[in-house]
Regions:
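Surface-exposed binding/hinge segments that line
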Residues: 16-73
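Aromatic- and charge-enriched surface segment that lines or borders ligand/interaction sites
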Residues: 1-13, 39, 45-47, 134-137, ...
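Alpha-to-beta junction loops
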Residues: 42-44, 139-148, 276-280, 284-287, ...
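Ligand-site clamp/hinge motif
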Residues: 1, 82-85, 110-156, 167, ...
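Short, well-ordered beta-strand elements
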Residues: 44-46, 92-95, 105-106, 121-127, ...
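Extracytoplasmic/peripheral linker and loop segments enriched in polar/acidic and small residues
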Residues: 34-37, 189, 204, 283-298, ...
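Acidic-aromatic pocket-rim loops
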Residues: 12, 299-335
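Append "and occasionally in soluble cytosolic enzymes with long acidic Gly/Pro-rich linkers
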Residues: 106-111, 159, 186-279, 283
Length: 335
């Protein structure tokens, strides 16, 4: 049921809650999954149209969560099919008590859980997009756990003995994407020149407060399959100028530089980063105009190819390198 709902447009639940299955469709699963068969009461068999090495890793993602068909049928019969998504029944250690859109999600420990009973009775997720506000809540004990602090706040957090700051390498990558359908970015020498002109180490210090590394691969260094032998682009303005001269652009040119309007773990301050890239490019004769839009509009316009250069990024979902390569570089991703 949970997979047929996403794959089959004729399933009565396909359009419930908007009918948007970004991950399922974006990962090409409608074409990959030929059939799902029941083997016995505790076993199902997936029939695929081709070998797919990361398939088991894909099934560990949120979109593959198993929903109760019995509950879905009951809600459809009652005329409230949306409750399947807004008041779901799962198999975890906590039971949903309350959901306030864009505000909070409240859970309580589920007495009938099949595994070890959780050590807390109540779990509340307070939806707080702004890292500064999250930090303020933590300081006031309005919350006890917060993720993704502002890099600028990390030093202060380390000095606060009441805070236990835990760190680990992120499973993400931030990047600047070039639109090769637009001149002069259709010339590889121009793209290389722009890359050589950017001082990534300075950006790591100023934007990430040192909590980052220069990316020379599409995948993070903590992920299996990472090739450390790949050579990074060094910061070399003179080489950038030479490449621009070879491309017939020694007098420079103008370009737009799209900066994300939101904070992300892979880019906590896109505006500051854009200003630094703008200054670096100016040193080799390239004049960049910083452009931004509301986040939804930003993504839509970028997908439509309106940009010349655009800041984007990706946070891994399942620990498999394919989740980076296929998601960002496959033919399906280009659409």
């Amino acid at each position: 049921f949970s997979f047929d709902r996403q794959k089959n447009a004729q399933n009565p639940y396909h359009k419930v809650s908007g009918g948007s299955y970004e991950y399922f469709e974006g990962m090409g699963l409608p074409e990959l999954i030929s059939e799902v068969k029941k083997v016995d009461d505790n076993t199902v068999q997936f029939v695929l149209t081709r070998p797919e090495a990361p398939f088991l890793a894909d099934l560990a993602m949120d979109f593959a969560s198993i929903l109760s068909k019995e509950y879905a049928d009951a809600m459809m019969k009652a005329g409230t099919p949306e409750k399947l998504d807004l008041n779901p029944i799962g198999t975890g250690p906590f039971q949903l008590q309350q959901y306030q859109k864009d505000s909070r999600i409240r859970y309580k420990a589920f007495d009938g859980y099949w595994g070890t009973k959780p050590q807390i009775d109540t779990l509340v997720f307070s939806i707080t997009p702004d890292a500064s506000v999250r930090y303020a809540k933590l300081q006031k004990n309005e919350c006890q756990v917060m993720p993704y602090p502002n890099p600028a706040d990390i030093a202060r957090m380390k000095q606060d003995k009441s805070i236990n700051l835990m760190e680990m390498p992120g499973l993400n990558v931030g990047y600047l994407s070039y639109n090769v359908q637009k001149k002069p970015l259709d010339d590889v020498k121009v793209r290389q020149a722009l890359t050589y002109a950017v001082n990534k180490e300075a950006i790591i210090k100023a934007v990430y407060q040192g909590a980052g590394v220069s990316a020379k691969n599409l995948i993070p260094p903590t992920m299996w399959g990472y090739n450390d032998d790949v050579q990074d682009y060094t910061y070399d303005p003179e080489k950038a100028k030479a490449l621009l001269k070879e491309a017939g652009l020694e007098k420079g040119f103008s370009i737009d530089l799209w900066a994300m309007p939101v904070q992300r773990p892979y880019n906590p301050n896109a505006r500051r980063m854009a200003e630094m890239i703008q200054a670096d490019w100016a040193k080799v004769g390239v004049q960049a105009k910083i452009v931004t839009y509301e986040w939804g509009e930003y993504l839509k316009r970028a997908k439509d190819g309106e940009h010349q250069t655009v800041m984007m990024g990706w946070t891994g979902d399942n620990g498999d390198p394919d989740n980076f390569f296929a998601t960002l570089f496959s033919c399906a991703a280009a659409k």
